């Protein structure tokens, strides 16, 4: 690709070559006031350009994230923002993300490159602590340790008629009152209090967990484009709700089945972490 600034050929999947990007970073650092003034004077023009070229920009971003360099920069920036140790080289990230997903076996493709997952979330990005991980597994796993993640997927697989096993490692959630839940949601909420209470008392649709021993199930909207209606809601524990995210029921269960059917060589000594989201 030809650099848009110096017109020299470079190998990065970016409009500007690395030397020119470094020059521009240093220039902008030294000329912050000029850069701010330029932005203010051209704000409307820039906004219109981004609006007119939205699809083009999204495709470019997708291609960049699918490149080894783009994936490396993304992971490195993510680690820096979370104050995590990062000791990986770009070559290592490229080789590791070429591997199939450690959890489900999904391959890296030209369109979508796998990312990295830290096996032990108390440790940063070092070679012995990272595995290749597809975007969906990474999003479903959140802050769980790998054993708990695989075991939960195994129970979901079993509950939906496939091979699997049950696990005791789930998070206990008390839930919210009808009024509090209704006031906090940003969607139209058409459920009555009686309907809401019935959903909370029923078993989780995805994993089968019962609302006992201080645990209360919640509600999942089957179609995330539709509001809280009786037809669109099912009983769902908090852990399955977070893991399912905005995925379809079919894709969520299929991913759990893929994970449950795969063998995993997980190192010993990793502490259990049953909460999916941790406060940092």
Language model features by range: what are they?
Residues 99-103, 112-121, 202-205, 215-224:
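Histidine-centered catalytic micro-motifs used for acid/base chemistry in nuclease
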Residues 9-16, 115, 119-130, 218, ...:
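Short linker/helix segments within small regulatory modules
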Residues 1-110, 126, 135, 139-205, ...:
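Contiguous alpha-helical segments
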């Amino acid at each position: 690709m030809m650099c848009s600034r110096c017109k020299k050929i470079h190998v990065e999947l970016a409009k500007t070559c690395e030397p020119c990007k470094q020059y521009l970073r240093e220039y902008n650092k030294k000329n912050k006031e000029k850069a701010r003034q330029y932005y203010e004077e051209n704000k409307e023009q820039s906004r219109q350009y981004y609006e007119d070229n939205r699809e083009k920009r999204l495709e470019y971003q997708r291609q960049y994230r699918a490149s080894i360099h783009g994936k490396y920069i993304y992971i490195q920036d993510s680690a820096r923002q979370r104050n995590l140790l990062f000791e990986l080289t770009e070559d290592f990230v490229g080789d590791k993300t070429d591997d199939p997903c450690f959890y489900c076996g999904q391959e890296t493709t030209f369109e979508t490159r796998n990312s990295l997952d830290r096996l032990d979330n108390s440790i940063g990005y070092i070679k012995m602590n990272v595995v290749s991980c597809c975007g969906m597994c990474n999003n479903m796993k959140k802050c769980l340790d790998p054993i708990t993640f695989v075991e939960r997927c195994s129970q979901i697989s079993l509950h939906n008629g496939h091979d699997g096993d049950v696990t005791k490692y789930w998070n206990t959630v008390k839930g919210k009152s009808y009024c509090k839940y209704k006031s906090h949601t940003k969607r139209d909420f058409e459920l009555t209090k009686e309907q809401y209470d019935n959903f909370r008392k029923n078993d989780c649709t995805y994993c089968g967990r019962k609302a006992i021993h201080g645990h209360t199930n919640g509600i999942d909207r089957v179609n995330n484009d539709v509001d809280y209606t009786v037809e669109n809601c099912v009983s769902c524990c908090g852990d399955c709700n977070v893991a399912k995210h905005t995925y379809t029921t079919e894709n969520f269960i299929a991913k759990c089945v893929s994970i449950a059917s795969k063998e995993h060589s997980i190192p010993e000594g990793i502490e259990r972490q049953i909460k999916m989201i941790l406060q940092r």
